[in-house]
Regions:
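Globular "head" domains of long coiled-coil molecular machines
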Residues: 16-181
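N-terminal pre-Walker A segment at the start of P-loop NTPase domains
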Residues: 1-18
Length: 181
């Protein structure tokens, strides 16, 4: 089923009554999806899905059917068990609804890795403009790479001011010196 720009199904415009939208950003395998699953208390996507092959995944409260919005703004219902058929180059966002209490307070947007060759900066730029804050996940063993710093600098300063840096995989730091840094 296709809905041409049907705002009843998907609305990127902020309204006064909209909930905060928290974007999870960082490099590939930095723990964004793991963090999403942890804070939501359940896996959002089937475990067989390779997150690095997905466009942004927007999770909101509810039980509506999942869908994807293509680059033209058209909305298409999707099967979460067939996400391997979703083309990241033609999908602006996947929206999934879950009956999770936390989602009554905020939406979560799980962004692809910032170095994803399948997604241009322009493709996620429109979506990140909808975010109210970012939780930036970075590997503790390789924290704050040049690519992360460059992407961070490209974000609106108002968004930077309301965001957090989360060091993931801290347990991989073995020496006390590395842990102290």
């Amino acid at each position: 089923m296709t809905y041409a720009n049907d705002s009843a199904h998907f609305d990127l415009d902020k309204t006064e009554e909209s909930k905060p939208r928290i974007a999870l950003m960082g490099e590939f395998s930095a723990g964004k999806s793991t963090l999403s699953n942890l804070i939501l208390g359940e896996s959002v996507l089937p475990t067989k899905v390779t997150a690095t092959r997905l466009p942004p995944v927007w999770v909101a409260q509810g039980d509506d059917a999942p869908f994807r919005m293509d680059m033209r703004g058209d909305v298409h219902e999707i099967d979460l068990n067939a996400l391997d058929r979703v083309r990241p180059d033609d999908t602006a966002v996947i929206k999934v609804h879950k009956p999770v209490d936390l989602l009554g307070m905020c939406d979560v947007i799980d962004m692809p890795g910032i170095s994803d060759p399948n997604m241009t900066t322009a493709a996620w730029d429109d979506l990140i403009q909808s975010a109210d804050a970012v939780i930036w996940c970075t590997h503790a063993t390789q924290a704050w790479r040049q690519s992360e710093a460059a992407t961070w600098e490209a974000l609106p300063h108002t968004l930077q001011d309301r965001s957090l840096l989360l060091l993931t995989r801290f347990d991989k730091l073995i020496s006390e010196r590395d842990q102290a840094r």
